A protein has these predicted regions:
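Helix N-cap / beta->alpha transition motif
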Residues: 31-32, 168
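A boundary/linker detector
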Residues: 1-27
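Rieske [2Fe-2S] iron-sulfur-binding domain
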Residues: 1, 32-159, 209-211, 231-234, ...
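C-terminal catalytic domain of Rieske-type non-heme iron oxygenases
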Residues: 15, 37-38, 62, 133, ...
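Short, charge-rich amphipathic segments
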Residues: 4, 18, 22, 102-114, ...
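Membrane-targeting and insertion segments and their boundary/processing signals
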Residues: 1-4, 27, 44, 146, ...
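A short, structural micro-pattern
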Residues: 24, 119, 126-128, 259, ...
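Short, flexible, glycine/charge-rich loop motifs used to bind or transfer phosphoryl groups or to couple energy/partner
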Residues: 18, 77, 162
Length: 425
């Protein structure tokens, strides 16, 4: 259970809120690089932390992220002309460069020098790993560049997609760090099923309810689900949570070679989230079959590539098939992440967490809330929150079958490149 006051504290992210101020200490994924494919291409609307922005790539290939609304009469710069190193409002011809400076006014005499008094809000950007990231905080507090391991893989070895989730960001994050739901909600009933999900033979499904261990670190936490398989062995699956909204988890390609994957739950505003989904291989280029979006429900066949809204959504009950639910899969909904969105959106835009009843299986959710509340407090007191140092960029997540008497940390932590563990809960 979370008090109503703390629920408000964690879920409200717009400017001037404590959580919004904490979020502005981190690099935030803003859009996919292919959305701005070339200099002087059309601008793109972006909404981050309640701010309505527009992104553009200028004639010199520089990326601008500025207030969407022209300061003259508040017309949208989305309709503007991206030309000659600036974005020009089509209403009265005011033009702004990537730094937000007004560089030309078509309706005012040059002799007045009025343009020198006008600017729009602009934010720092960097293109890393096929994603354009934004920093909305104070320049002197800018953190290390977001060079996560997946962003450094060759373009042929990684893939990134995104999809809108119609809930507050915390619902998505909590669903991501909640491992106990996966073998329940995402299971399929037949060993030879072609539907995405955990088959009856998977250790997730074969084992009993997991024991969860959470190790708090200087970036967030690493956590493991320990599932008994038989008298001799346990299945261990580890994850990483990096403040404020990153998850890293182990996956596997259709061909069987390891793939690392994860999600980033980016708050658009208090009630909508843009979920960035990434996967990469350390050993081989990704094939079309390898790309997890096909199984997760995040690909072009499932998500409109203009609006980034899922074709399976609350307005059509996520195309739930009751016959499939009866005979083939636990939910009857196609796509693992589509199932996640369906259930998380069913909880309302912002969950009333004061009405929850949490148990031991919710340990990772509880600890995530504690760390986020601590980050809010740290920032409000002028400190530096966890997760901005950049020491965590090489983190990985792994899974394996180990003897029951094995020390899973000793066996697996070296493969996770984890930094200092501070406490265990």
């Amino acid at each position: 259970m979370l008090s109503r006051e703390n629920n408000e504290l964690l879920t409200r992210v717009e400017r001037g809120t404590p959580m919004g101020s904490a979020m502005r200490r981190y690099w935030i994924p803003a859009l996919l690089a292919w959305e701005l494919p070339a200099p002087d291409c059309p601008p793109v609307r972006v909404k981050l932390l309640g701010e309505e922005l527009v992104a553009f790539r200028d004639s010199r290939d520089r990326i601008g992220l500025i207030d969407e609304h022209c300061p003259h009469r508040r017309a949208s710069l989305f309709f503007g002309r991206n030309e000659e190193c600036g974005l020009r409002c089509v209403y009265h011809g005011w033009k702004f460069d990537v730094d937000g400076r007004c560089v030309d006014m078509m309706n005012e005499p040059e002799s007045l020098h009025f343009k020198e008094k006008i600017s729009v809000a602009s934010y720092a950007t960097v293109e890393v790993g096929g994603v354009i990231w934004a920093y909305l905080g104070a320049p002197e507090q800018r953190p290390a560049l977001p060079t996560f391991a997946w962003t450094q893989a060759p373009a042929t070895h990684r893939h990134v997609s995104k999809v809108v989730q119609e809930t507050n960001w915390l619902q998505g994050l909590e669903g991501g760090v909640d491992t106990s739901h996966a073998p329940i909600m995402h299971r399929v009933f037949k060993a030879d099923s072609t539907r995405p999900g955990f088959k009856p033979t998977h250790p997730f499904v074969r084992s009993k309810a997991p024991t969860l261990v959470v190790d708090v670190t200087d970036y967030g936490y690493q956590y493991a689900s320990l599932r008994p398989l038989d008298e001799a062995n346990i299945h261990v699956r580890t994850y990483q949570f990096i403040l404020p909204f990153h998850q890293i988890r182990p996956s596997q390609s259709e061909g069987g070679h390891p793939i690392m994957s994860g999600h980033i739950w980016v708050p658009m505003d208090d009630e909508n989230t843009m979920v960035f989904n990434w996967d990469y291989s350390e050993t081989a280029p990704l094939t079309d079959d390898d790309r997890l979006e096909r199984r997760l429900g995040n690909g072009p066949l499932d998500v409109d590539q203009g609006t980034f809204r899922s074709t399976r959504n609350r307005r059509n009950n996520y195309m739930l098939d009751r016959q499939v639910q009866k005979t083939e899969s636990f939910t009857g909904i196609e796509g693992i992440n589509t199932q996640d969105r369906a259930i998380q959106e069913s909880m309302g835009r912002i969950v009333y967490r004061s009405r929850e009843h949490l148990g031991p299986a919710d340990k990772a959710v509880i600890q995530a809330r504690r760390l986020l509340l601590h980050a809010v407090k740290t920032v409000s007191e002028g400190g530096t929150p966890r997760g901005v140092a950049g020491t965590y960029y090489a983190l990985r997540a792994v899974e394996g079958v180990l003897p029951r008497d094995a020390d899973w940390r000793e066996a697996l932590t070296p493969e996770m490149s984890a930094t200092r563990i501070e406490q265990t809960v």
